[in-house]
Amino acid sequence: PSSSHTVGPMKAARLFLKNAVEEQHFDAASTVMVELFGSLALTGVGHGTDKAILMGLEGETPEEVDPESVDLRFHQICRDEKINLLGNRMVSFSTANNLIFHKDEQLPHHSNGMRFSLMGHPQKTLFSQIFYSVGGGFVLEEKEMENSSCENSIRVRYPFSSASELLQHCENQSMSIADLVLTNEKTWHHEDKIQEGINSIWYVMKGC
C-alpha cells in the first residue's frame, strides 16, 4: 500500500465526517458521495484507496483498524449497499454510484485530491469538502492548501531532485538519508506529527 493512497484517504474520510458532525449536518445525512481525482483515481483501486476510504467513513483510523477485517467489511458494504458512518449512522451507499473515479480530472492544488459530499433528501448537498493527500499519510483541507504557500514554494534545507544530489548532501553533511529527509520534512511538520505519520504507514503496511 501507499501512504498517500491509503493512510491519507482513510484519515480524510473520517475527518470529513467529524467536521460534518461539528457543523451539525451529520444527523440529516441519507448518503455520502466520494469523488477521487488525479493519481487517486488512476491508481487508487490497485493501492486499496477505495477500501481505505470506506473504512475511514466507518470511523476507522490507520492506527486502530484491523487489516484482516478490511476485505470482509468492504465486500459487505458492496453487497448490502449500506455503510455505517462513524460506526453510528447507517445510510445507503453504492460503490458503483457513490464512489466516483475522475480519471481525466485533477484538482488544482495536488494530484491526490478527494471531494466528499454529505447528501440529504432529496439529493440535497448538506456539506462538502475537498481534501488532499500530500504524502506521508498527511492530509490537508482545501482551505489549508490555499492559505499556505504550499510545499513547492517553500525551500527545504537540503533540496534535491535526484539520488545523486541526495547522496551528495548526505556526504557533505555527514548525515544518513533518513536524518536528512527528516530535516527536510520538518519544513512543513513538527517532528511528533512526522513520527505519527511514519507509525501509521508502518502499521498499515505491516498488516498487509
Which role does the model predict for each range below?
Residues 1-13:
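Conserved phosphate/anionic-ligand binding catalytic regions in large, soluble enzymes, centered on
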Residues 18-208:
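Feature of Fe-S/electron-transfer and energy-metabolism proteins
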